[in-house]
Amino acid sequence: MERIAPFKLSGPHTLAEAAALFAATPGARPIAGGTDLIPNLRDGVGKPPMLIDLSGIAALHALTITSAGATIGAGVTLARLATDDQIKRALPVLAEAALTVAGPGHRTVATLGGNLCLDTRCVFYNQSEWWRRSNEYCLKHGGDVCHVAPQGKQCHAAFSGDLAPALLVLGANVEIAGPHGARHLPLADLYVEDGAAHLTLGTGEILVAAHVPPQPVNARAGYRKARARGAIDFPLAGVAARVETRNGCITDLRVALTGTNARPFLLEGTDELVGRPPDDDLLTQLAKLVQKQVSPMRTTVTQSNYRRQVAAVLARRLTCELAGGVVARPTP
């Protein structure tokens, strides 16, 4: 771990002030909780001339839930998400996902926006500067080789945020502010499958809030993750699901994944499983969909095929639990 390169620190009080600072300081980075950014800076990942502290912008701390849906500011801490009574009643999957992130100390300062915009990770990238230099810089650090897939020219660093899959199954969209004004887009469109540049945020743009539409009365949602230890660690694979049932059959199914690809994503093909009971045949088909669509690479200390199998089993078990099904233990 190295000494952090010198930088200026500024604390705007409005979104307009923040936009002006970004426009005036090329290369500036936003900071809120800093639980991911600061360790990366200590490892020499990036040397921004300025950190723009967003924690003083009141608009980013809004948390409102009405019959029209929920608005959750990007500055809302994960500890607040995990314990807020409104969230636990209306959107318990968000509280559940927030509670899995890191440890209690991290969650008191880590924010929703930071988790949604979490940098992608790879064992060949998240190392000290001397380690990266001695092993040849990778694509994500300005080099010309991906150590995970040396024959390719795409970075495969994995996205490891826990809140994104939960918000994806809830149908959330995000509000973004920048030098050209505000815009809204589906959360899925915030990401692309490129580990070196996985966010679609433009220069000077910041995440303002996530907006969640009202949820069906009969919908149940949950989040599960696998990690090396029972706390602190990023997901090797994480799965969120939202299930609607009627008369013993699934009428709607959404599944989203994290930790396996360069972006969190909604599983495709689940519409073909609706109208059926949550039996072993349906859950086996669901597991096969997961195995086909995840793309884990050797970006963690575990084997990629293990993460593929784990993601499928997590999706199967969680869907079964939410739908009230009873099936035999799956064989990967």
Please provide the spans of the model-predicted regions:
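C-terminal structural segment of proteins
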Residues: 1-332
